[in-house]
Design a protein with these regions (language model features):
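N-terminal export signals and maturation junctions of secreted/periplasmic proteins
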Residues: 1-9
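Short, contiguous alpha-helical
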Residues: 8-12, 30-85, 112-115, 119, ...
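Amphipathic alpha-helical packing segments from all-alpha helical-bundle domains
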Residues: 18-21, 110
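Short, contiguous, well-structured surface segments enriched in hydrophobic/aromatic residues
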Residues: 24-25
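Phosphate/pyrophosphate-binding loop motifs in nucleotide- or prenyl diphosphate-using proteins
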Residues: 85, 89-93
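A short, structured beta-strand-centered segment in the mid-to-C-terminal lobe
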Residues: 93-106
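Vicinal oxygen chelate
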Residues: 107, 112-114, 123
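A Lys/Arg-rich helix-loop hairpin that forms a DNA/phosphate-binding surface
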Residues: 126-127
């Protein structure tokens, strides 16, 4: 066993969990909010998809994200960045601007790109410390205080730690959140947002 194999398994699990939830939810559930003060269900899955793209492309490599491609720029609000540290109203507009089918297609493209990049990684390359803050500098909104505060603690860490936190632990936290909220919604515990 090696560390790279463990991280590959973690990444594959993250993609699978997000895809399963996108496939299993209904179009109506996409824009539902189960409880006051929580995100709409679609936003959680969009954010999880975006955070993986951001982590591998922008944070680690300093290259354009797949969300920067014309077909995704037209569908995803640029002011939403990758979904961290943004106002609730912007998060709600993200959900209104896209749908679960589009996000599933995007996630499939992200998975392919991440797989291609990861195939060239070794335990040694993943020990490198990326210039994460510098990689954000050319991106509108990415260094805004509220957005940067959400990821600042990753700056200065080796690539493997940056990968396992947003693309592993963070995804699993949001999957638990999503599952609880979807369960509440399906049980009829929906309440209007306060």
């Amino acid at each position: 066993m090696n560390g790279t194999a463990v991280i590959q398994m973690l990444l594959n699990g993250s993609f699978t969990m997000i895809h399963e939830r996108l496939d299993e939810m209904t179009d109506e559930e996409w824009s539902e909010r189960a409880l006051p003060g929580t995100s709409q269900l679609g936003f959680i899955l969009w954010h999880c998809s975006r955070i993986i793209d951001w982590t591998v492309q922008c944070a680690l490599q300093g290259v354009p994200e797949l969300a920067d491609r014309p077909e995704w720029r037209a569908r995803f609000l640029q002011e939403a960045c990758y979904g961290a540290g943004i106002p609730d109203a912007v998060a709600d507009r993200v959900v209104a601007s896209t749908n679960r089918t589009e996000v599933a297609l995007y996630l499939g493209e992200v998975k392919a790109a991440v797989g291609e990049w990861f195939a060239h990684q070794t335990d040694q390359t993943l020990d490198a410390v990326p210039p994460m803050k510098a990689n954000q500098a050319g991106r509108p909104g990415y260094l805004d205080p509220a957005v940067w505060a959400e990821v600042e603690d990753l700056n200065g860490l080796p690539m493997w730690q940056v990968l396992v936190r947003p693309c592993g632990a963070h995804i699993r936290r949001h999957m638990g959140e999503y599952d609880v909220l979807l369960g509440a919604l399906r049980a009829g515990a929906v309440t209007p947002r306060a």
